[in-house]
Amino acid sequence: MGSDKKTPEEKRKHKRSSPSSPLDEVKSKRQNIKGDEERRKEKKDKSKKEKHKSHSSEEKKSGEKHKTKSHKHKDKSKNKFEELSKDDYFSKNNEFATWLKDKKNLFFSDLSSETARDLFSDFVIQWNKGKLDSQYYEGIATGPRSSHAWNIKK
């Protein structure tokens, strides 16, 4: 059990495989880091060039322009309401009764069912053209039904 000590030759064998100094290792690591950074920058530059393609002035003049705000506004006003048909007679009855009173000076209760249907078709035409006031498209809770002034006390 005598000798746990290693000879100087054995110590040299286990320390390092190459005879380089610790400063050489630091330098080589720094060089690798710099090389990596340069490669990353090159990749970024390439990707930027691919993403940012400029258009010539000829393409812009040829009519490939985006819609202006006024065009967008017109499109929204068209889709603001749903189109009606004669089948919507019962669902839009409050709006129809209000329209009768305001535009035709008639009350819904004074009309026969046939006359009311005919006038409703006129109402549908005005509705679909978008010529009615915004209150009609937003919805009306109750409409005027008769000319009688009800005197209900609370």
UniProtKB/Swiss-Prot annotation:
Tissue localization of expression: Specifically expressed in flowers pistils, especially in stigmas and styles. Barely detected in roots, stems, leaves, sepals, petals and stamen.
Keywords carried by this UniProt record: Auxin signaling pathway, Cell cycle, Cell division, Developmental protein, Nucleus
Subcellular location: Nucleus
Organism listed in the record: Nicotiana tabacum
InterPro entries membership: SCI-1-like
Disulfide bridge map: none
One GO cellular component term: nucleus
Outcome of gene disruption: Enlarged stigmas and styles due to increased in cell numbers.
Chain intervals for the UniProt region annotation (Disordered): 1-84
Name the record gives this protein: Style cell-cycle inhibitor 1-A
One GO term (biological process): auxin-activated signaling pathway
Basic and acidic residues composition bias: residue spans: 1-11, 24-48
Amino acid composition bias (Basic residues), ranges on this chain: 63-77
Protein role: Component of the auxin signaling transduction pathway that regulates cell proliferation and differentiation during flowers stigmas and styles development. Involved in the regulation of auxin-related genes.
Main localization, broad class: nucleus
